[in-house]
Amino acid sequence: MIAALLPSWAVTEHAFTDAPDDPVSLLFPEEAAHVARAVPKRLHEFATVRVCARAALGRLGLPPGPLLPGRRGAPSWPDGVVGSMTHCQGFRGAAVARAADAASLGIDAEPNGPLPDGVLAMVSLPSEREWLAGLAARRPDVHWDRLLFSAKESVFKAWYPLTGLELDFDEAELAVDPDAGTFTARLLVPGPVVGGRRLDGFEGRWAAGEGLVVTAIAVAAPAGTAEESAEGAGKEATADDRTAVP
């Protein structure tokens, strides 16, 4: 599903179930040490999403290696590579690309079900809640509140590698096209500079199926460069600022 949302230069791998193997056996020692005290659910999702990521990196011709969480939990990718991971109940996925092609990637998958009570007010702007109400009546097959949440997660995942800074839910205003399968995010804070141009937002794509809503953003690398340079403004991130949604 996610592959269809990204350019051809992005490589994706996904899994709908965890491997039957002992999850620790799928990890490099450094990774296993990072989740030594994790509960089984966390251990399985951590291992499986890295199996997906290593498979995607292999398709780029890169050898397997540890993918350790860095500051804010963002994975540390090999030099010359950008990527993004996502996991939710019943899905794990990864997308990678060479830095010559992509400045940043952001992917997210969520169950196609309503957000828990009270969460929408925490993650949305009044303008977003207005169009959500209209879409809920028009297309009840998609839980648009969950799609909004997923899209904002993809926005953050695309934003963070470019800035190293936090982006609150109310600092990007989203609009979704239900027919084209696209969305736009207008940044309400100064955006990162990529290739000498300051971004004022992100464009992404979405899909629903297999009991999921999935979203993806690809920021292309500046033409003729092998890596992006970025700067931005905002608040520093911490590892657990973001709202976790079941």
Curated annotation (Swiss-Prot):
EC assignment: 2.7.8.7
Broad enzyme group: transferase
CC terms in the record's Gene Ontology section: enterobactin synthetase complex; plasma membrane
Stretches for region Disordered: 223-246
Keyword Transferase: yes
Basic and acidic residues: bias regions: 233-246
Gene Ontology biological process terms, A to Z: enterobactin biosynthetic process
Ranges of Low complexity composition bias in the record: 223-232
The keyword Transferase is annotated on this UniProt entry: yes
Pfam family, one: ACPS
GO molecular function: holo-[acyl-carrier-protein] synthase activity; magnesium ion binding
Family to which the UniProt record says this protein belongs: Belongs to the P-Pant transferase superfamily. Gsp/Sfp/HetI/AcpT family.
General function of this protein: Transfers the 4'-phosphopantetheine moiety from coenzyme A to a Ser of an acyl-carrier-protein. The enzyme is able to transfer the cofactor to a broad range of enzymes with acyl- or peptidyl-carrier protein domains.
Protein name, per record: 4'-phosphopantetheinyl transferase Svp
Organism whose genome encodes this protein: Streptomyces mobaraensis (Streptoverticillium mobaraense)
